[in-house]
Amino acid sequence: LIKKCPWIIKPNDIISITSKVHGTSGISADVLCKRQLKWKDKVAGWLTYVPDTAYDYLWSSRKVVKNQYYNKEVSEGYYGCDVWGEAHKVLQPFLTKGLTLYYEIIGWLPTGGAIQSMGGKAYDYGYDMPIWDPTTQTTPYKYNVHFGIRVYRITYTNPDGIVYEFSARQVQQWCKDKGLTPVTELYYGYAKDLYPDISVSE
């Protein structure tokens, strides 16, 4: 978009430039979800207000909800395993009501395959390939050992459905406060200061 429409960025705009990692996109949230009313709720609804929504956890790939409680037909998908569920386990303790995290999962899959590769070369980012342990009859799969998470976007949705977008700087600070890793920030500031030798009139 920027290459096609460079004029959309003005000299006094605040911009953020971050590094691109090769992984798979994930989303984790604690948001208001439709809940299935039990018969006693329906009876109580005749006498008083019974909310039909409640805060609950959701996790997904870029397009598919992976939480089986909200997507009954969900499959293991492209990778044949729920790598998004593994990432969500890491992030769930940091989710407060209304918060949604957008991130890239990098490294290895629970099955031992690379999340992303090209020309036979895995983009492992220094993480170890999970190996079958004959003693426990399992393949250990640990965060920051076999896979990593890079948060690049955060939103907060209030009870009225209004969405607040964290700034790029707020994303960096939030991750730092929680001990999580954001995408690497290469530049943050005024567009005109990125290349100070170029006049804004040119």
Q: Positions of the model-derived regions?
A:
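Core nucleotide-handling region used for phosphoryl-transfer chemistry
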Residues: L1-E202
